[in-house]
Amino acid sequence: MFGQGYYQGNRDQDSPLQRPPAAQFSSAYMEQQGSHQSLQEHLAYEQLQLQQQQQQQQQHAAAPHANGDGYGAGFTDIPTMLGSVGAPSPAFQPPMVVGMQQQPINTPPPTATSIYSQNNNSFTNVNDTTLAPGHSSPGHYSNSSDYSGQQPASSAYKQFGGSESPLQPAALPGLLDGSLGDQTLVGNQSSQGAMLSRQSLQCSSVPQSPNGGQRQTSGVGNYMYFERRPELLSKSTQEKAAAVKLKVENFYQSSVNHAIERNQRRVELESQLLSHGWSEERKNRQLSSLGKKESQFLRLRRTRLSLEDFHTVKVIGKGAFGEVRLVQKKDTGKIYAMKTLLKSEMYKKDQLAHVKAERDVLAGSDSPWVVSLYYSFQDAQYLYLIMEFLPGGDLMTMLIRWQIFTEDVTRFYMAECILAIEAIHKLGFIHRDIKPDNILIDIRGHIKLSDFGLSTGFHKTHDSNYYKKLLQEDEQQQNGGNMGKYPASGGGGNGGGNRNTMLVDAIHLTMTNRQQMQTWRKSRRLMAYSTVGTPDYIAPEIFLYQGYGQECDWWSLGAIMYECLIGWPPFCSETPQETYRKIMNFEQTLVFPDDIHISYEAEDLIRRLLSHADERLGRHGANEIKNHPFFRGVDWETIRQVGAPYIPKLSSVTDTRFFPTDELENVPDSPAMAQAAKQREQMLKQGGSAANTAQAKEDLPFIGYTYSRFDYLTRKNAL
């Protein structure tokens, strides 16, 4: 017997003192792990059991049973969740005992497995077969010590109809030598089989749901069917659930993307090291340097930036949806340009796609022709873009200062604009709003593009319905004032010098007119700060809503080139609606003044750029424009290393003399910006609870807007 007396009689005969419970448990544990004589008996029993199972399978294959189920009647009531009734797996074969009738023993399901599945003293798996409920294995806990009350001996067995205390392991020697009677064992088997049969009936009586699921109506652990009906929930709950889903998806997606990028950087560096004949020490230094950069980048990504981390030096730009500030990071003292965008206005004005487009362009570009993005983040009210500060201002500032460029200066800037636009097109984007305001000058005098899809009044300036409505208002005013309508066809006639009509054959500028143009250009700058905007550089196909491609950016380039050589845009007018009218009739309104001389190549290039989309130069790629005679002699590969015509001279890193900061002081904030500033002050006074309440539904589209970049943030001049 394996009971308490058996252990004491064989193990503690020479010991004068009674062992404590812990020592008895340790001895029982060693028995379970194979250091006891009973292990050989268990192995012999299992081998005999396996042979009997093989014989039963052969008999079953030769002569099926009469009941038609292909197996013994003891398994007819097994629930379907425990396996197939008609073809049980070999793991469910009932063990047979020597000297007994060939009657199968109902065993518990395979979930009642042992805790230890391997013998520590050998590589033999001693639990490959399922034992009877009353039988032990080397992997089962033993009840041979006082510690047995704390052991989870038969919870799974009890779940399927077993008693509180199954047969003790001491019954095994009796089974081997035949001392245990058939009636005792069969009696235990019949009671266990009856219990399993009752639970099987309960399992089979579980009602089915209309969709095939089951509802849990008994103690058997079946699945419970739930019908999804989100419409019963409140709208706020549905929005919160959608927000959680988006945030979780964005979290894991960004984590996977960062892991992929990290692996790509490692693979690229290793391939570069293989192509160089460097020593192992130098290669290890390069790999170690990459590891340090990865650690630094990981720390920076975990750092949550906020507006409080930056000190505003000066406002250098304003718009309808936000502003641009010159800021200094408090902990490092580095200078950046911070672009802020109002979330509520982005949501109301349907600018969500444009917001994402700008961030994607800046994040996906490594080109020297695009403004560098270091970081992007957001709070309850604003989106923030931390970009490099270009102290040279923009091309509009240069045009206001010098009015007209020479052809050599124009050739340099137009060549760089071609390369910049080509870089954007290679990324798969269309700028659609190229104008002098969005062409920035860096500290070396070379240009970079900015404002990708987020220029002031972007949506409105591209909407033809907006201008048509303004034109109808003008006609109504003219009819009310007894003024004649504009003639339908061109030619001479009245209003030859009136810039508000389509009948202008040529604009002959006097000094007074040039002063008016300078005044117009300054008002044009103020117009850029408002919600009205200007369509001076927009291609006509954008207004038509008939589909357009990358060729629309080359129209804008032609309009800018015209302004650089002539002194004003080709379709400028005092009102945006009149500019729209001229653009839609560009074949009649595009004229070159007689008092300003330009070369034939320059005029030809402008005319071929300001043409119909299907005839426009550049529709098949930027090389068409590069090969034009106007750019003869331009070295396209090294132009960025060539000295620029104008290099800004700065007195300090925060010098903003090339930005219209004086004009911005007189430009009031837009109503939306003013309202947002008041709300921010109230939130700061009320504390964090009000800030949490401010998270409205417009936050949902901006999930994933936060961005950080490896190659920028690991450089010395980054954050």
Swiss-Prot record:
It holds the Pfam family Pkinase. Residues 1-75, 100-219 are annotated as: Disordered. CDD domains: MobB_CBK1 (cd21773), STKc_NDR_like_fungal (cd05629). It comes from the Eukaryota. Its EC number is 2.7.11.1. Residues 40-63 have a biased composition (Low complexity). ATP binds at residues 316-324, 339. GO terms for cellular component: cell cortex; cellular bud neck; cellular bud tip; incipient cellular bud site; mating projection tip; nucleus; serine/threonine protein kinase complex. One of its GO terms (molecular function) is protein serine/threonine kinase activity. One of its GO terms (biological process) is establishment or maintenance of actin cytoskeleton polarity. SMART domains: S_TK_X, S_TKc. It catalyses: L-seryl-[protein] + ATP = O-phospho-L-seryl-[protein] + ADP + H(+); L-threonyl-[protein] + ATP = O-phospho-L-threonyl-[protein] + ADP + H(+). Residues 24-38, 112-130, 139-157, 181-219 have a biased composition (Polar residues). Keywords: ATP-binding, Kinase, Nucleotide-binding, Phosphoprotein, Serine/threonine-protein kinase, Transferase. The active site is at residue 433. Residues 632-717 form the AGC-kinase C-terminal domain. Protein kinase that seems to play a role in the regulation of cell morphogenesis and proliferation. Belongs to the protein kinase superfamily. STE Ser/Thr protein kinase family. COT1 subfamily. PANTHER family: CHROMOSOME UNDETERMINED SCAFFOLD_135, WHOLE GENOME SHOTGUN SEQUENCE, MYOTONIC DYSTROPHY S/T KINASE-RELATED. This is Serine/threonine-protein kinase CBK1. The gene is CBK1.
